[in-house]
Amino acid sequence: MNLPRAERPRSTPQRSLRDSDGEDGKIDVLGEEEDEDEVEDEEEEASQKFLEQSLQPGLQVARWGGVALPREHIEGGGPSDPSEFGTEFRAPPRSAAASEDARQPAKPPYSYIALITMAILQSPHKRLTLSGICAFISGRFPYYRRKFPAWQNSIRHNLSLNDCFVKIPREPGHPGKGTYWSLDPASQDMFDNGSFLRRRKRFKRHQLTPGAHLPHPFPLPAAHAALHNPRPGPLLGAPALPQPVPGAYPNTAPGRRPYALLHPHPPRYLLLSAPAYAGAPKKAEGADLATPGTLPVLQPSLGPQPWEEGKGLASPPGGGCISFSIESIMQGVRGAGTGAAQSLSPTAWSYCPLLQRPSSLSDNFAATAAASGGGLRQRLRSHQGRGAGRAPVGRVGAAAVSGGGRGL
């Protein structure tokens, strides 16, 4: 295979230039011509090497950065895929998002409750405002520093919804915006072994009974305690009055009580029945109302009413003792069938402002007896005679009744 030889460069005519002396001189532009034999030998060696490389099966080696390329790529004009160059020329693809993620700090593995607890525990007074908690978290963790406005509402919601955080109002001498937040003392151990990565369980504050944990600086008054006590207490120092004995009031209509209660508890204060008070003479009403500070209808426990004597009311068994006398008030009922209440102790008169002293009661009884007619006077006189030989207390009561009778 004969290859065309490289053409010799044509010799250009030599230019004549004038010397400085004015003489024409010849300048050699091409220089010395190389030997033609040496050039021909080099061309033959290059052609032989080219033939040897073309006859080899497989890959054809080409000088392209020291990398062997397939033959078809050389004939086609170069590689179509840049990945076929090799590892030296392969550049790893890097996007802008990947580079930005590499620079962004990782999110801490702590919950918002753990972050708030960290902030409160590191403060000197163990309390912080919402802005102080956010400042601690932003300064401690760069992740939250970059996303500050987004998680502030989450901190606020966790403070309000979890019982382990307690709101403390500001003191008057410390003005400022926002209230303080602190930890409930019972929630100090809600994290396992002091690690903020895991909580034991959700803390729940126990609801206390209102007023149970607050000590009373002063004892409650006796009247207030008696109103709220379901059982009668020792307000007046006297035992509870028994129920009326069946048969003691034979003429009492069914559904009608012989006395009315002033208090829902067992009878301490007894009132006259409404029909009996309506039938009392007007003179007795004037005598009762004239006494200041007393109630006209307030009387100790009464047996059969004196003005009902004419209606055929049987006298109580055990003698002709009248149940509303001074003696029955001071000493109580002598027999079991009288139906009167037990006597009140002397301390009862000091505790009860509504009850009158025995002396004032005797005056009211005397006025009521004067209005009831002559039959009542005879009963009082007979009772005075029988009470002369009884106990000293009975004599005092009888004397009081007799004194009222003389005034009549």
From Swiss-Prot:
GO terms for molecular function: DNA-binding transcription factor activity, RNA polymerase II-specific; RNA polymerase II cis-regulatory region sequence-specific DNA binding. Residues 1-54, 71-104, 385-408 are annotated as: Disordered. InterPro entries: Fork_head_dom (IPR001766), FOX_domain-containing (IPR050211), TF_fork_head_CS_1 (IPR018122), TF_fork_head_CS_2 (IPR030456), WH-like_DNA-bd_sf (IPR036388), WH_DNA-bd_sf (IPR036390). Its main location: nucleus. The keyword DNA-binding applies. Keywords: DNA-binding, Nucleus, Transcription, Transcription regulation. Residues 30-45 have a biased composition (Acidic residues). One of its GO terms (biological process) is cell differentiation. GO terms for cellular component: chromatin; nucleus. It comes from the Eukaryota. SUPFAM superfamilies: Winged helix' DNA-binding domain. Residues 1-29 have a biased composition (Basic and acidic residues). Residues 389-401 have a biased composition (Low complexity). Residues 107-201 bind DNA. It is found in: Nucleus. This is Forkhead box protein D4-like 1.
